[in-house]
């Protein structure tokens, strides 16, 4: 800033006149000052506004990334639920059949066909088998559960609407993983290779009132139905007819051969 001052001019007069003039005239005006302020130089834009814009851009970018990640998560869940789980369910469900020689019903060996639907639950470690009504006889329709966690097998005879529970026979029933591998190996065709049939005989012993103690899988199968415990007969009798009085037969397979389970009442 520049300061400029102006002083008044002094006339060459005598002192007395000057005194008179100074006495009669008003006091001279003070020196005039003019302040000149130099023009301000144009300031560059503050960095603060630029920093605020950068922060806002980062926030928008972060929000966009969050939305994108959420979209990817939802898409992954959708694909997992509707494609992977559906494919897994298809791989664990089998509709298959087996051709076997029936040597139990008569002396003449006849070729029979057995169909069943199999659901294998690898994580829960159990198998569920549905045997529809046989086309040419040979047993009752049934639902069967092999619970490897509980070590139990349950037969629901659909014709009688009764449930029968017995200890799991691991010498006949393949574990879920082995049974699944067997069925996957033969999934290319409709039927398993031709095989044979064996027979096991059981007798009911007592009525089961506490079905919850049998486990959730068997409970859902047998709830609301008369349920009995079975025991294997130590010495098998010779039964000429599967439809003999006081006995019912269920034919099924959980291995490379067919099993006929005879369930008989106490004689």
UniProtKB/Swiss-Prot annotation:
Name assigned to this protein: Integral membrane protein 2C
Q: Give the function comment from the record.
A: Negative regulator of amyloid-beta peptide production. May inhibit the processing of APP by blocking its access to alpha- and beta-secretase. Binding to the beta-secretase-cleaved APP C-terminal fragment is negligible, suggesting that ITM2C is a poor gamma-secretase cleavage inhibitor. May play a role in TNF-induced cell death and neuronal differentiation.
Q: Which UniProt keywords apply?
A: Cell membrane, Cleavage on pair of basic residues, Disulfide bond, Glycoprotein, Lysosome, Membrane, Phosphoprotein, Signal-anchor, Transmembrane, Transmembrane helix
How does the entry describe its membrane topology? Single-pass type II membrane protein
As one GO molecular function, the record gives:
amyloid-beta binding
Q: Where are the transmembrane segments?
A: 55-75
Query: Where does the source fall among the domains of life?
Result: Eukaryota
| Compartments it resides in | Lysosome membrane; Cell membrane
Q: Which cysteines are joined by disulfide bonds?
A: 163-222
Task: Indicate the segments forming the BRICHOS domain, all copies.
Answer: 136-230
Primary location group: membrane
Q: What InterPro entries does the record tag this protein with?
A: BRICHOS_dom, ITM2
PROSITE patterns per UniProt: BRICHOS (PS50869)
């Amino acid at each position: 800033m520049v300061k400029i001052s102006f002083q008044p001019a002094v006339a060459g007069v005598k002192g007395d006149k000057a005194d008179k003039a100074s006495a009669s005239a008003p006091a001279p005006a003070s020196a005039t000052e003019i302040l000149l302020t130099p023009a301000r130089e144009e300031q560059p834009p503050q960095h603060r506004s630029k920093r605020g814009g950068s922060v806002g851009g980062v926030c928008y970018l972060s929000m966009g990334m969050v939305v994108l990640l959420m979209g990817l998560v939802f898409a992954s869940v959708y694909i997992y639920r509707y494609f992977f789980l559906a494919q897994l369910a298809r791989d664990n469900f089998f509709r298959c059949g087996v051709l076997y020689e029936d040597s139990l019903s008569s002396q003449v060996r006849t070729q029979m066909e057995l169909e069943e639907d199999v659901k294998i639950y690898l994580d829960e470690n159990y198998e569920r088998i549905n045997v529809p009504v046989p086309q040419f006889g040979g047993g009752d329709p049934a639902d069967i559960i092999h619970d490897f966690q509980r070590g139990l097998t349950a037969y629901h005879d659909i014709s009688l609407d009764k449930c029968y529970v017995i200890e799991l026979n691991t010498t006949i029933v393949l574990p879920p993983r082995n049974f699944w591998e067997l069925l996957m190996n033969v999934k290319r065709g409709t039927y398993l290779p031709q095989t044979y049939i064996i027979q096991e005989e059981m007798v009911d012993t007592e009525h089961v009132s506490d079905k919850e103690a049998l486990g959730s899988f068997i409970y859902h199968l047998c709830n609301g139905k008369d349920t009995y415990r079975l025991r294997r007969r130590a010495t098998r009798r010779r039964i000429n007819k599967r439809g003999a009085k006081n006995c019912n037969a269920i034919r099924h397979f959980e291995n490379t051969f067919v099993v006929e389970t005879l369930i008989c009442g106490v004689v």
